[in-house]
Amino acid sequence: MRSHFCTEISEKDVGKTIKVAGWCNTYRDHGGVVFIDLRDKSGLVQLVCDPSSKAYEKALEVRSEFVLVAKGRVRLRGAGLENPKLKTGKIEIVLEELVIENKSATPPIEIGNKSVNEDLRLKYRYLDLRSLNAYEIFKLRSEVALITRNTLAQKGFLEIETPILSKTTPEGARDYLVPSRVHEGEFFALPQSPQLFKQLLMVGGMDRYFQIARCFRDEDLRADRQPEFTQIDAEMSFCDENDVMGVVEDLLQEIFKAIGHTISKPFKRMPYKEAMENYGSDKPDLRFELPLIEVGDCFIDSSNAIFSNIAKDPKNQRIKALNVKGADALFSRSVLKELEEFVRQFGAKGLAYLQIKEDGIKGPLVKFLSEKGLKNILEKTGAKIGDIVFFGAGDKKIVLDYMGRLRLKVAETLDLIDKDALNFLWVVNFPMFEKTENGYHAAHHPFTMPKNIECEDIEEVEAHAYDVVLNGVELGGGSIRIHKEEMQKKVFEKINIHEEEAQKKFGFLLEALKFGAPPHGGFAIGFDRLIMLMTKSNSIRDVIAFPKTQKASCLLTNAPSPINEEQLRELHIRLRK
């Protein structure tokens, strides 16, 4: 039907007769001469037709998004008529034959216009996908999947599918449940990850497994979350953390070659505690400086009882400083007010600061600090004339969070972030357990191997867990797993999953661990998030062919939707009103 894609045609084809096919991107009638920009997956080429052509009458019928097959002769555009914005901007095709394969209703959205309301774009997603940008995104997505398969296969990994219909083990996010017609009153769950099955594959001697896995989580949505998503999932036997990290680094190095980036290995490693204390985040963006500085000891003798009491409780509370170079000339009073309102959203009671001016140090904190305290702050933060030092004080968790967010906000405001940089980081030595209202739960998941399980302070127990971070975004992570039944039971006990409940939920895993499970570990990388970062897309929805909205619905198909009474009866379900 066609001899060339649109952008395959160039000056070397001048004089040749070729056939192209695609959609009418734009249509123009200039004094009887018809110009059509034809679009296919590769890009655009201009078709031209005057009244002397036998295709002229057909060309007059063409409108936006009509499906066309065109035959014609390639010629150079006239002097001064070239379009440098197009790859084919120096040539055009003089129409000899034109077939309208299909007509189109007037499109409700302009193809490729990102300013169109997103809900409308998602409702007509099949039109939205016609944009050249969308094609490039999914072309890259396909390439990355192929690179992943080839790279891991070369390292001895087997691609193995794990079940989609699985057992509900509600830990963390809610499961999507599927009622069983055969087993009345019982349900399957869609997998939140292949975690337990890939561990069982290691017990089964598969040694190295991977899949590009579909996962499902019924959780509140954010800009970078979807109820169904894809991850690069892998597991290895007889390995330690360094082995797993090495595989991930090799894989990411190969993947980023696809967009022309050379990334160096090994990636920097940072303990979780250092990341939180210095950057207020377990996924710090290191494309810019601005570390948080601990200055609690500078407030020990403060005349403000609130600050001095916080300084005397370093286990549970923090006083953190953020020195912003040159900010005194850049931040007006209104900007300072905006920053205060910003941190209040995250639990701050206010935002104290010191302005380092030529005629002295100004700010509401000055009167509460001794001369020694002020001197120590300047030394610790490296503050000079023209700088502003911001302070956060109070509960450790709250302060680290809002000061970390302030760090990012300031960097964005002052344009300190190199948008073209790629800064990879491993965050390691995560806490094994986190405190909740009802005791403790596993910070990653309860199948992670702890480092020091006998530690008297449960909050000091660390995990053999690791996250890979790119530019402040968690790409993925993993851990070394528990491979002995006794240790698995011990971890369950720590998070109040006692024997009976453990057997009910995870009895099949505990049974498997009795039969010589090898040491093993693995990782998962968020595939959608990876593609979002590689393409610099604004939303994860841009890199998924048919995404859900932030209300977990599909505007294209109107899913989820009600089902009829007969279907409900077959599934032994009665709805309560």
Curated annotation (Swiss-Prot):
ATP binds at R217, D218, E219, Q226, E474, G526, F527, D528, R529. It comes from the Bacteria. It is an enzyme of class 6 (ligase). L-aspartate binds at E171, R217, H444, R481. CDD domains: AspRS_core, EcAspRS_like_N. The keyword Transport does not apply. It catalyses: tRNA(Asx) + L-aspartate + ATP = L-aspartyl-tRNA(Asx) + AMP + diphosphate. GO terms for cellular component: cytoplasm. PANTHER family: ASPARTATE--TRNA LIGASE, MITOCHONDRIAL, ASPARTYL/LYSYL-TRNA SYNTHETASE. NCBIfam families: aspS_bact, PRK00476.1. Homodimer. This is Aspartate--tRNA(Asp/Asn) ligase. It comes from Helicobacter pylori (strain P12). The gene is aspS.
